[in-house]
């Protein structure tokens, strides 16, 4: 049996006494040392785990971490308790997300628009993007500006900036509220549905890289791409992947699931080591 300490250490986390903290492999797949959303502990022989960032399901955490489920002893009562806590947490986070979205203003004419235009993006900016001042950045404890993107689940994605308009160097992108299965709609068009990871990537595709009108969605992360809920009616789908292993794996997983549901699927991988905003700006791989 794998206990809480084993899982914590396997995820690259820290164990202190009777509790561990580690990166959540679902919503923090980078597993950086500053990422510690997942709390784990053993209590009365029961395994308890909770993701404080996204409220991720522990069974999905186990799967994403590559841990053998047949060696896990999950107590049903503990799992029900974790599920109830996750539901309460998600409701509270969703309320915070809607409040932030409600006070944010349209992105046109803001430092957020200046940032996007500075990255070569020329397409009209969607109503799903707004700009907010004085947004709390948890990892640093500072109050910063943020580009706020509305997710189809009601959650928001935040990209944090200094008051000068420069994007902060670390932990710049964070989600607020339940995002699983959702996406940010960046453009609407009569052509195919195009799914990518990042917001800047999607806007870059809509800035002339596709060669045809399209509906563009940003799934916000590689795990988000894998979990994306597609429209019920199948059609044409272009999966625009980042040029790395995580992007390739996520894109192929989405493509396979879509194909099985009757979608006509095309893969559009970025060059190795690049994303589509790099391509738009004429960058080349090192």
Q: Which stretches of residues belong to each language-model region?
A:
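Non-catalytic accessory segments of DNA primases and related replication-initiation nucleases
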Residues: 1-119, 124, 245-249, 259, ...
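Terminal peptide-recognition signature
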Residues: 24, 51, 116, 149, ...
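A generic structural motif
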Residues: 74, 218-221, 264-274
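Short, basic/aromatic recognition patches
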Residues: 122-139
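Phosphate-handling DNA/RNA-contact segment within nucleic-acid enzymes
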Residues: 137-232
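Acidic beta-strand-to-loop metal/phosphate-binding motif
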Residues: 195, 235-246, 269
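Acidic, metal-coordinating catalytic cores used for nucleic-acid/nucleotide bond scission
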Residues: 223-224, 241-251, 272
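Short, surface-exposed amphipathic charged segments that create phosphate/polyanion-binding patches used
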Residues: 230-235, 277-286
